[in-house]
Amino acid sequence: MSFESTPVSLVKCATYDEDLVYQKVKEAVDLLGGMKNFVAPGQKVLLKPNLLSGRPPEKCVTTHPLVVKAVALLVREAGATVLIGDSPQIESAKKAAHKCGIGKVADDLGIDIVEFEPVTVPNPDGKMFKNFTIGKILTEVDRVINIPKLKTHGLTTLTLAVKNCSRNAQGRVASKDLPRRGRPFCQDAFGPLYLY
């Protein structure tokens, strides 16, 4: 599948009612062929929500915990093992997750929250970087499911799912580089992060 023909599904969800969120996330995934189209039984799958910082869901900074829960349940129903992780800007992933409600989801479902321990990986064809320091867990899982929070950003206007992958690079390093280098940097730098 090429990037030019990647399908997208959009489903409206009027409230953060737990049953409704699950139903709508499942509907969106089913429009793309179902979770079994993305993960296979026995695979290890990292859910990558936006855990920028430990803010409660009503502050709209991080991915809503009920969305993470719905995706986790769908991945499990497809027979895969689920992990949750990110590289928050200031605190550990576990601390941020518990502050924003994702930690409770992980506890309730028996899912491990993993920290992004740094490892350097090559990127020989990169325009901006010839290597990246990313979370080691990204090299150890079979799949990564990006679960961003829809919001705006000063360097990319509307980030959609792209900016959430910048957290795959070590959080504090990524946050220092972005404002200093500007929009062209963001556009050329984010693409190669999807390779890992």
What label would you give each PLM region?
Residues 1-196:
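N-terminal and secondary-structure boundary signal
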